[in-house]
Amino acid sequence: MEPFEQHTGIAASLIQINIDTDAIIPSREIKSVSKKGLENGLFAEWRYTSLNTRKETPAFILNQEPYRRASFILTGENFGCGSSREHAVWALYQWGIRAIVAPSFGSIFYSNCIQNGILPVLLETEKIRKLKTFVELNPAINQLTVDLKDATIIAGNDIRYSFEIEPNNQQNLLQGLDAIGSTLKIIPTIEAFEKNDHRNRPWVYFK
């Protein structure tokens, strides 16, 4: 996983509540455990008029320029609710999404974002509306910047919002560590504990 420190990019607005993981990537789009190609199924029910022909729906924001190159999503409450499928986060990442800004997230989806290099930014609805207004004045030029070290999101010269993120999640993203990487980092601590525990409770280790 790549370290996440700062990112600047185009933001697409999907201001709806309760966008669930089945909307993000329908189950029929999940044909393997591979991440490759999942971006083609991202928001498939909304992006295509026909799932068979893959004819695009012109009105859907990610089918429009410059939003085809969006790396931020501005959205509503409870984004990523529903089933726990990690493919939803994989599809977003494969598309190029690096940060999602919402008032709240599905709890498992939020954790999956952290584990896969997407920054979930918790921000109040009114602040998201102001970001949306800024972006839509000139979406190709009016890009957003998120600085994870400072936990701030920046829009132009006048808008700068702080957001909260648990220190452990922040450090894992900054260092590019998923759950396995975090565990490998503390192997010496684990081995020291096992050695001490073996000495104090030898019966636990009988075979």
What would you call each of these model-derived segments?
Residues 1-76, 80-207:
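Cytosolic catalytic domains that perform sulfur/thiol-centered chemistry
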